From Swiss-Prot:
Source organism (scientific name): Xenopus laevis (African clawed frog)
CDD domains (alphabetical): AdoMet_MTases
Name under which the protein is recorded: Methyltransferase-like 26
Gene that encodes the chain: mettl26
TM spans (from-to): none
Domain of life the protein comes from: Eukaryota
Family: Belongs to the UPF0585 family.
């Protein structure tokens, strides 16, 4: 099993926000996690929220193996085996029916992937979420053109030096993308380490 120290640090703060969007009275909340990474997040969320039925996904083979290992280690009956998913491809290739998901989770992908991935994520969410469903993202964001603190500015420069197509997105650009996909930015939640959860809801 792969271990990311950042995932260990942020899994509890993210969970405290996420649980507000998983109705405890609902028998089953079906969710897709895009870019699941090591599998630490989906395992943590599934153990804490037994009515959350998660489908993790990744493109990297080592990550896919790690996710499967976490599922086995914790004997998670509410997590499916991970799917190989390229979020930059059309939502029709993702293997879900339109309006079939109540929640899509995406943690720490948007700033470290090409714009086609973020655009694909929002287009997919617009088609696959049920009306009233939530796209839940986490990471660093600038707000109305302002990126703070300096550590996030430095991080953004570091990302762009590795790949000019990478970098921190502005919330207004994501809001415009959401609007074009039939969603709206409902809430921003500040979390530790200068990151935020953004909650987009499908109309």
């Amino acid at each position: 099993m792969l271990v990311a120290t950042a995932a260990d640090r942020n899994k509890d703060p993210i969970l405290e926000v996420l649980r507000q969007y998983v109705d405890p009275a609902a028998p089953k909340v079906r969710a897709l996690e895009v870019a699941s990474g090591t599998g630490q997040h989906c395992a943590h969320f599934a153990r804490a929220l037994p009515n959350l039925y998660l489908v993790p996904s990744e493109l990297d083979p080592r990550s896919l193996q790690s996710i499967s290992a976490y599922i086995s280690h914790w004997s998670l009956s509410n997590v499916e085996q991970p799917r190989t998913l390229d979020v930059s491809k059309s939502w029709e290739t993702w293997g879900f029916k339109p309006n079939s998901l109540q929640l899509i989770i995406c943690i720490n992908m948007i700033h470290i992937s090409e714009p086609s991935c973020t655009q694909g994520l929002f287009k997919g969410a617009g088609h696959l979420l049920q009306p009233g469903g939530v796209l839940f993202t986490y990471g660093p964001y600038s707000v109305n053109g302002i990126l703070t603190p300096q550590s996030n500015v430095d991080f953004n420069l570091s990302l762009k030096s590795r790949n000019p197509a990478w970098g921190v997105w502005d919330t207004s650009d994501l809001q415009n993308l959401a609007t074009a996909c039939g969603m709206s930015l409902e809430r921003m939640v500040d979390l530790p380490a200068n990151n935020k959860c953004l909650i987009f809801r499908k109309k």
